Amino acid sequence: MSGIDINHKYDRKVRRTEPKSQDVYLRLLVKLYRFLQRRTNKKFNRIILKRLFMSKINRPPLSLQRIARFFKAANQPESTVVVVGTVTDDARLLVVPKLTLCALHVTQTARERILKAGGEVLTFDQLALKSPTGKNTLLLQGKRTARTACKHFGKAPGVPHSHTRPYVRSKGRKFERARGRRSSCGYKK
């Protein structure tokens, strides 16, 4: 009599347990936050550690404009804004508020504007000393669906109420600009 073999098809849990990158500085941060997460047992450190593992697509950039908006809405002027990703400048933002920011990477112009406004820019190892439990911090992240590839996802282009961008071979006169767009060529929708 033979036993039924167990199906091991779904045994593997697919999630990152370390960053794909071989960047030594990132890996040092992972070591640090692994220690903090184990010793403090705080949700903040668990989230930071998880985000340090993420791919670049899942760590989208955040502009100063959005940071300023969320910072103002939170109404906690003493809190440190934490972004596991890149912070970019936004020329449309005229007045940068005085804030303390901690991010993996800050563009040069964004850094200059924050410092000029009387704020400061921290690294994650400095944040670990200042706030090891995540107390008095504001954790933010950019929009993951803002990239161009995401604009093609969703209902098929052309069906009612679809705002999906079509995959067009070329942007010329003949490509998706004639039939259905003007009455002289077939019909006009």
UniProtKB/Swiss-Prot annotation:
One of its GO terms (biological process) is translation. Its main location: cytoplasm. Transmembrane segments: none annotated. Pfam families: Ribosomal_L18 (PF17135). GO terms for cellular component: cytosolic large ribosomal subunit. SUPFAM superfamilies: Ribosomal proteins L15p and L18e. The keyword Ribonucleoprotein applies. The keyword Zinc does not apply. It is found in: Cytoplasm. InterPro entries: Ribosomal_eL18 (IPR000039), Ribosomal_eL18/eL18-A/B/_CS (IPR021132), Ribosomal_uL15/eL18 (IPR021131), Ribosomal_uL15/eL18_sf (IPR036227). GO terms for molecular function: RNA binding; structural constituent of ribosome. Keywords: Cytoplasm, Ribonucleoprotein, Ribosomal protein. Belongs to the eukaryotic ribosomal protein eL18 family. PANTHER family: 60S RIBOSOMAL PROTEIN L18 (PTHR10934), LARGE RIBOSOMAL SUBUNIT PROTEIN EL18 (PTHR10934:SF2). This is Large ribosomal subunit protein eL18. It comes from Drosophila pseudoobscura pseudoobscura. The lineage of its organism: Eukaryota, Metazoa, Ecdysozoa, Arthropoda, Hexapoda. The gene is RpL18.
